[in-house]
């Protein structure tokens, strides 16, 4: 780490946010699947409606998914689908 205080440091947290979103969606997906739900349908229902009851409470999945904004989830899903970085 430099001791040069004449330059502004930049911090890019977009990769961390992407990793967090993927981790949360994976955990939620697995929890929904374990409970016998169709995870894709349930996640779509949540993303469209904003109603968290589409997501099971099992393994804290509902609380996890609510840590993310729905628009942020959609942004990451679309970027991943289109393979955009």
Swiss-Prot record:
InterPro entries: IreB. Pfam families: IreB. It comes from the Bacteria. Belongs to the UPF0297 family. This is UPF0297 protein CPE1779. It comes from Clostridium perfringens (strain 13 / Type A). The lineage of its organism: Bacteria, Bacillati, Bacillota, Clostridia, Eubacteriales.
């Amino acid at each position: 780490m430099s001791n040069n205080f004449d330059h502004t440091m930049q911090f890019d947290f977009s990769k961390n946010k992407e990793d967090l979103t993927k981790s949360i969606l994976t955990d939620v997906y697995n929890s929904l699947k374990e409970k016998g739900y169709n995870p894709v349908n349930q996640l779509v229902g949540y993303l469209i409606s904003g109603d968290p009851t589409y997501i099971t409470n099992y393994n804290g999945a509902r609380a996890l998914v609510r840590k993310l904004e729905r628009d942020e989830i959609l942004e990451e899903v679309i970027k991943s689908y289109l393979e955009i970085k």
